[in-house]
Amino acid sequence: MVDHLLPVDETFSSPKCSVGYLGDRLASRQPYHMLPSPISEDDSDVSSPCSCASPDSQAFCSCYSAGPGPEAQGSILDFLLSRATLGSGGGSGGIGDSSGPVTWGSWRRASVPVKEEHFCFPEFLSGDTDDVSRPFQPTLEEIEEFLEENMEAEVKEAPENGSRDLETCSQLSAGSHRSHLHPESAGRERCTPPPGGTSGGGAQSAGEGPAHDGPVPVLLQIQPVAVKQEAGTGPASPGQAPESVKVAQLLVNIQGQTFALLPQVVPSSNLNLPSKFVRIAPVPIAAKPIGSGSLGPGPAGLLVGQKFPKNPAAELLKMHKCTFPGCSKMYTKSSHLKAHLRRHTGEKPFACTWPGCGWRFSRSDELSRHRRSHSGVKPYQCPVCEKKFARSDHLSKHIKVHRFPRSSRAVRAIN
């Protein structure tokens, strides 16, 4: 079947196609063009997947396989068996014959691809990468490393900022004068200013500092204060140290006013037990200063401080002053000032509309009170005798009757 197609004296040199090479070609899922083989010119249905042509025809070894599978392996075996049959019949062409005119290298050089395909491979630049502008595409590992480095930097900066704030507060409090607590023998405690200073702790720092447009800061200072035991009390226990109890004195500076929170020592009911707790005043109360700039003695547990001038905005509440000569009254509302000026001018714009009544008043509340005399309405009632009055001042006078009975008043008049 094959001899009549292939002359005996014509030699077919088969390149040595190793099994590994065929496997690589099969593994790469790329379509290749198949050349018609002289073996498949007959009416047989099986076409050879790999054909070796002569150098004149410039053919090459091609593997006709879409992917590794049992069909591809079967086609390779059929091709090998057909080549073995040709080698045994002709005696001149075999798979293992190495005397062919075309060697493996020359066959590789003479191979010409029939089908052109374009592949996009990544370009690896050997030069400097900074010269070429390309988008930055970080990997997940690089992103994680970047986030970890930033978090570590923030954690390191946080304690540094906190320490800076503490240093700033300490510098502000260090420049201020501090009050010292001197307990007395009777158990009372007083707060005295330091020599050469008239203000409490924290007042100097608030006054000397630059004025800010924002909210006024609140400075807190804690000072250790030695509190001795009261006179007449013996040692609490034999093992107790003779040193006194140390508590903290709190200095508060709020809007330019400094307060010192004085501790209050609560004596223990049982002298055999040591006093471990010191109670401080629950509610701070600002005491008025006594004398020129000096702080007077205050009761234990109270908040004693120097009172600074009030805000000038509070003095502007009564800004409407009477301009009549000899009158110095001031009012918070302009309407009240106008009603007051009518008393000086004698103007009475509010007239009673009751028939036959020509009374006029300078204030509207006086007119309302006058109308009750015509209508008979008495909205003010005595809670004791349930007597009603049209005016509130009449009710106030009536209540005095119940406080001082007539009999007692008569007795006092006789005496």
UniProtKB/Swiss-Prot annotation:
The keyword Zinc applies. Gene3D superfamilies: Classic Zinc Finger. One of its GO terms (molecular function) is DNA-binding transcription factor activity. Keywords: Activator, DNA-binding, Metal-binding, Nucleus, Repeat, Transcription, Transcription regulation, Zinc, Zinc-finger. The keyword Repeat applies. Induction: In the heart, up-regulated by the CLOCK/BMAL1 heterodimer. In podocytes, up-regulated by retinoic acid. Belongs to the Sp1 C2H2-type zinc-finger protein family. The 9aaTAD motif is a transactivation domain present in a large number of yeast and animal transcription factors. This is Krueppel-like factor 15.
